[in-house]
A protein has these predicted regions:
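N-terminal secretory signal peptides that target proteins for export/translocation
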Residues: 1-10
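Bacterial N-terminal signal peptides
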Residues: 14-27
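N-proximal helix/coil linker or "cap" segments that precede and/or mark the start of modular domains
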Residues: 25-45, 115-118
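A short beta-strand-turn-helix
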Residues: 42-63, 86-89
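Short pre-active-site segment immediately N-terminal to redox-active cysteine/selenocysteine motifs
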Residues: 61-63, 68-71, 150
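Hydrophobic beta-strand anchors of alpha/beta hydrolase catalytic cores
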Residues: 64-65, 96, 154
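Structural microenvironment flanking redox-active thiols in thiol-disulfide oxidoreductases
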Residues: 79-121, 133-141
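Thiol/disulfide oxidoreductase modules built on the thioredoxin-like
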Residues: 120-122, 129-179
């Protein structure tokens, strides 16, 4: 005797189940926070004159200007400390400005940069250099060009926009703080 509950095809059942699953999770997708993930942020391309304009625009603050790249091992060591320092001193008058020296014309290199930013989620603006040619380095700092264009490179500016510290190596959090705190105290 034949069963009245005989299944002739599982295809409609599977499609119906899939539709129910999508319907069930769709309210979660709608109610998720609207903030875009950090790795989708746009990175503005900067020329040397833009870097100088960023320093001038932050007159009255201590500017911590750092150049780095995702392929730079010391940069990976230093970056978490820069984030800690930025979070600790951002309300005290420190502005961190980061410029990536990844190749902005290479989609995979720029993609690596965006991925890294998504993973680290820095609380400061990150730009990308317009060029990796000597003119960019010279335009930012003749000293940097003369010293071999190494990374990471940091320049720290006082509240008047005068460069008071220059490093072409990774800094520790303690070194950053020992440079920044006296500049914050000087008004």
């Amino acid at each position: 005797m034949r069963s009245p509950f005989r299944v002739t095809s599982l295809k409609p059942f599977a499609l119906g189940l899939a539709a129910l699953a999508l319907l069930a999770i769709s309210p979660l997708a709608v109610s998720a926070p609207s903030a875009a993930p950090a790795d989708t942020r746009e990175m503005k391309v900067v020329q040397p004159q833009d870097v100088h304009a960023l320093i001038a625009a932050n007159k009255g603050k201590v500017v911590f200007l750092n150049f780095f790249a995702t392929y730079c091992v010391p940069c990976h060591t230093e970056f978490p400390d820069i984030i800690k320092m930025a979070r600790k001193y951002q309300n005290a008058g420190v502005q961190v400005v980061e410029v990536s020296m990844n190749d902005n014309s290479d989609p995979s290199d720029k993609g690596a940069m965006l991925k890294w930013l998504g993973e680290t989620n820095p609380p400061f603006p990150v730009y990308i250099a317009s060029s990796l040619e000597d003119d960019f380095y010279k335009g930012v700092s003749p000293q940097w060009a003369k010293d071999g264009e190494g990374l990471p490179m940091t320049m720290i500016f006082d509240r008047d926009g005068k460069m008071v510290h220059y490093y072409q190596r990774a800094l520790t959090l303690a070194e950053m703080e020992s440079d920044v705190t006296p500049l914050l105290a000087a008004k």
